[in-house]
A protein has these predicted regions:
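C-terminal, non-catalytic "cap/extension" segments appended to globular domains
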Residues: 2-4, 20-23, 36, 40, ...
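Active-site recognition of the HExxH zinc-binding catalytic motif
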Residues: 257-276, 294-298
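Post-HExxH zinc-binding segment in Zn-dependent metallohydrolases
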Residues: 286-326
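Divalent metal-coordination and catalytic microenvironments
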Residues: 8, 148, 264, 297, ...
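All-alpha helical catalytic cores of prenyl diphosphate-utilizing isoprenoid enzymes
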Residues: 174, 178, 205-209, 215, ...
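Inter-helical turn/loop segments and adjacent helix faces that build the functional surface
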Residues: 119-127, 164, 187-196, 276-283, ...
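Contiguous, non-catalytic segments that form substrate-binding/exosite surfaces or channel walls
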Residues: 107-257, 451
Length: 499
């Protein structure tokens, strides 16, 4: 190992330690921090973010990156370390253009905006959140202009969350999917609806937490390097190598919400936990492709978790932990988790209509950054698009524009990744069945860990060594297409609804 590489790794360790402190503070803010501690913790977030920013834009760091980019050094590095140097040099050059005071203000404002969103959602009042959102939008535009002054802001944001992706490709794939979804939804809407009255009862939230532990263990989440807590909005975060955490939210009148949030977040966490240890402390362990990440969470949640055969080996175990389910026939539960109908809340939408929720958000984000729609006009635009795409209109802001936290922390460009992930899943399904055989049989026999192992070997262990297009080509041998997902929907729901 060269002296330059040793110096770089020592420097990188300092940056990672700041990132760990910031991640831990955010975890605490979302899960346990008392109300009166919020401003102090936000101040700490600002401090650590500023120190991290200073380190990541220091001339010493840039000098190390440039030395390691020289052929005599670069050619001696591992592929993962080469990726680290390329990506970090790119980010260094971008961040070097951002004034330190602006960066500190931006980070602090996003954290403050998250708390304003929580208050606005609780009050179902967009006006409480609007000034914060307006400022985050404005500062996000400024943030991008500092880094890449000649690039379209929204194009940059999409690429930030899904490396190598562009809006032209997304427009094409989403149009392909939308063309197939709308007539399928019409056929489902015309079919008889199942009787789900057995689920109209109260389910103990504490017992739901035990069910979550059962499900996480069943699909392969390791509690030796993971933890679970409660938050307003379920999420997954990696604090450091060997520490991947998930949260959930529990509703007494809707246990299916926490069940599938557990499986969804578990899919995210398993991906992070399964990254090869040789990649720790490199850019490969920092999975920066959210579509690829969402493909894992949504594969577990939908392709596996909504398959009736997934539940055959564990339904009785779940009922023992959550006794109310003993009064819910297995067939009724299966119909409930595959019930398709337009709904207000994205995170509770079925897998068919979910894509339309994402298309709505994608179109609004493009309107924000390309059409300069006014922040105060966003609730009306949201409601208009809900009616156009799903045929329903929110009764209030909480079940409308305030339902997601993403915009509060500046995560514009993230939403398309959810639907991209589902599109990738249709392709994974076909590849898995070629290697492991019929999925129904694998699940019926309780071989869920065989699937987790397949995903680990094909996808998880590489982290972000390859972008999503490269992963699809390596795993599936094809370019990205929505057709496999549409075939999956058509085959599955023609059986469920008998058309």
């Amino acid at each position: 190992m060269s002296q330059t590489l040793e110096q770089f790794q020592a420097y990188q360790t300092r940056l990672e330690q700041y990132d760990q402190a910031i991640a831990l503070l955010y975890w605490d803010l979302q899960t346990a921090a008392p109300k009166d501690s919020i401003e102090a913790k936000l101040s700490a977030v600002g401090y650590f973010s500023t120190e991290s920013f200073r380190l990541s834009t220091a001339d010493e760091y840039g000098s190390l990156l440039k030395k390691l980019s020289a052929p005599e050094e670069y050619d001696q590095l591992s592929p993962a370390m080469q990726l680290t140097i390329r990506r970090n040099l790119r980010d260094f050059e971008r961040f070097k253009r951002i004034p330190e005071a602006f960066y500190t203000e931006y980070v602090t404002e996003k954290a403050r905006s998250e708390k304003a969103w929580e208050a606005a959602k609780e009050a179902s009042d967009f006006s409480v959140f609007a000034p914060h959102l307006d400022k985050v939008i404005s500062m996000t535009k400024e943030y991008v202009h500092y880094m890449e002054p000649d690039q379209d802001v929204y194009e940059f944001l999409v690429g930030l969350f899904e490396d190598g992706m562009d809006t032209e490709t997304i427009d094409r794939i989403f149009a392909e999917l939308k063309e197939g979804l709308l007539p399928l939804l019409a056929k489902i809407e015309a079919a008889p609806k199942p009787d789900l009255s057995a689920l109209q009862q109260t389910f103990d939230p504490d017992a739901q937490k035990k069910v979550q532990e059962l499900l996480l263990s069943y699909i392969g989440f390791s509690f030796d390097c993971g933890a679970v807590a409660e938050s307003m909005h379920p999420f997954t975060t990696t604090l450091c190598p060997g520490d991947v955490r998930v949260t959930n939210h529990y509703y007494a009148d809707n246990p299916i919400s926490s069940i599938f949030s557990a499986i969804h977040e578990g899919g995210h966490a398993i991906f992070e936990q399964n990254v090869d240890k040789d990649f720790w402390h490199t850019a490969a362990a920092q999975i920066n492709m959210m579509g690829l990440h969402e493909s894992q969470s949504r594969f577990y949640e939908n392709i596996l978790g909504r398959n009736p055969h997934f539940w055959t080996p564990i339904y009785e175990k779940m009922s023992a932990l959550l006794p109310e389910f003993k009064t819910v026939p297995f067939d009724t539960f299966i119909k409930a988790i595959n019930d398709v109908h337009p709904s207000m809340i994205r995170t509770e939408a079925d897998e068919v209509t979910y894509g339309l929720h994402i298309i709505l958000r994608y179109e609004i984000e493009k309107a924000i950054f390309r059409d300069n729609v006014k922040t105060d006009d966003l609730p009306a635009l949201w409601n208009q698009k809900m009616q156009e795409l799903l045929g329903i209109t929110p009764a209030n802001d909480a079940e409308g524009i305030l339902q997601d936290m993403h915009w509060s922390d500046g995560s514009f460009g993230y939403f398309p990744s959810y639907l991209l992930g589902s599109i990738y899943d249709g392709m994974y399904l076909e590849a898995i069945q070629k290697d492991l055989g019929d999925l129904d049989t694998v699940l019926e026999n309780g071989r869920i860990l065989d699937i987790t192992h397949w995903l680990k070997e094909k996808i998880h262990r590489f982290g972000s060594m390859y972008n999503s297009k490269e992963v699809i080509e390596r795993v599936c041998g094809k370019e990205i297409s929505a057709q496999p997902l549409l075939r999956y929907f058509e085959e599955k729901y023609s059986k469920v609804y008998g058309f």
